[in-house]
Curated annotation (Swiss-Prot):
Official protein name in the record: CASP-like protein 2B1
Residues on Extracellular side: 51-72, 131-164
InterPro entries (alphabetical): CASP/CASPL, CASP_dom
Family stated for the protein in its record: Belongs to the Casparian strip membrane proteins (CASP) family.
Organism: Vitis vinifera
Alphabetical keyword list: Cell membrane, Membrane, Transmembrane, Transmembrane helix
Origin: domain of life: Eukaryota
Subcellular location per the Swiss-Prot or TrEMBL entry: Cell membrane
Topological category with respect to the lipid bilayer: Multi-pass membrane protein
Ranges annotated as spanning the membrane: 30-50, 73-93, 110-130, 165-185
Quaternary structure (record): Homodimer and heterodimers.
């Protein structure tokens, strides 16, 4: 019997046959390409929204300017999303080339490299979102015990734009988590029986 083009042996061990493997690989590669395009777009959007965010407030004739570099968590968020966007662009181009060539991923070292890279970027973006979200909570509600002011009461526009950037960054993180699952599937299926011989290497 088969499911999604994957043959199943009597011992319930998945066996990927040559033609079926190419069909599955094409579907996986298409889903991967879509996700990488989403990550690239949202990553750039998040970095631009946060990185260009400034607001000037005049307090008793003194100008106070809020910018993303005032909070290290936001700097981390911009850098992490910039890295994620660049990485996804490179990997997206790899997907396009392999789809045009009609090749199937048989190289275990390459599969391990993609899997490891996706894991690193996923953890990086999740950490950046968590740090930025925590800093944003402090900016919105303050910390009375430490006498930290509610910064967003003074810099409303700045905080709103940061919030939009964080929402975009959350989309990047969730997409990277899903993409990590896809790259894990692409890697570990190479250890699941006969990989077949048809199709080019990539």
């Amino acid at each position: 019997m088969s499911y999604l083009g994957v043959g199943v042996s009597p011992g319930n061990v998945p066996v990927y046959h040559g033609t079926n493997l190419k069909v599955v690989d094409r579907r996986v590669r298409l889903a991967e390409l879509v996700l990488r395009c989403v990550i690239c777009g949202l990553g750039i959007l998040a970095a631009v929204l946060v990185g260009t965010d400034t607001q000037v407030k005049v307090i008793f004739t003194i100008q106070k300017k809020a910018k993303f570099t005032d909070m290290k968590a936001l700097v981390f968020l911009v850098i992490a999303n910039g890295i994620a966007a660049a990485y996804s662009l490179i990997q997206g181009l790899r997907c396009v080339v392999s789809m045009v060539r009609g090749s199937v991923l048989f190289s275990k070292p390459l599969a391990w490299a993609i899997f490891s890279g996706d894991q690193v970027i996923a953890y990086l973006t999740l950490a950046a979102v968590a740090a930025a979200a925590q800093s944003s909570v402090f900016g919105e509600f303050g910390q009375p015990e430490l006498q930290w002011m509610k910064i967003c009461n003074m810099y409303g526009k700045f905080c709103n734009q940061v919030g939009e950037g964080i929402v975009s960054a959350v989309g990047v993180s969730l997409s990277m988590v899903i993409l990590s699952g896809i790259s894990a599937f692409s890697l570990f299926r190479l250890y699941g029986g006969n990989k077949g011989t048809s199709g080019g290497r990539w």
